[in-house]
Swiss-Prot record:
This is 22.0 kDa class IV heat shock protein. It comes from Glycine max. Forms oligomeric structures. The keyword Transferase does not apply. It is found in: Endoplasmic reticulum lumen. One of its GO terms (cellular component) is endoplasmic reticulum lumen. Belongs to the small heat shock protein (HSP20) family.
Amino acid sequence: MRLQQLNLFFLLLCVAKANGSLLPFMDPPITLLADLWSDRFPDPFRVLEHIPFGVDKDEASMAMSPARVDWKETPEGHVIMLDVPGLKREEIKVEVEENRVLRVSGERKKEEEKKGDHWHRVERSYGKFWRQFRLPQNVDLDSVKAKLENGVLTLTLDKLSPGKIKGPRVVSIAGEDHQQGNLNNDGAKQEL
């Protein structure tokens, strides 16, 4: 008797695997839970496709997101890479300030709208962006090189030799018994 039950079970299992099932179809419990969840909480990404949003194209809402950056230090210097897809050389500005700040800015111009155009989707951003970086003391500010290739702006900054790195300057404080002006460590007067 036990052997007949096993044979019947085996037969039903084989038929079920062959897509000619004699057994009623039942979802696994996890699928039933997922269906219950999806009925109560629809996929937020699919919902957004069906809501009739107007396309808001004002400059404040379409400001460019900041450029993504990778910055690495090598034995020879520093390399900063920024993603600026679709921008031309003329649309990007690289500045180095005396306070050791490197600033990269740019602007993607808004595409001209022609009469009769109907926008279905606007995802690319336009407008201005800027990123700035405080450079370490070992960077030679006069050695900054920039190269734009395949939408990636690569900035290369050489390192100063250890003997050329300027440390903080000590300023003497004058009191009642000292002359007016600032003195350096040698006692000589210097301009600030």
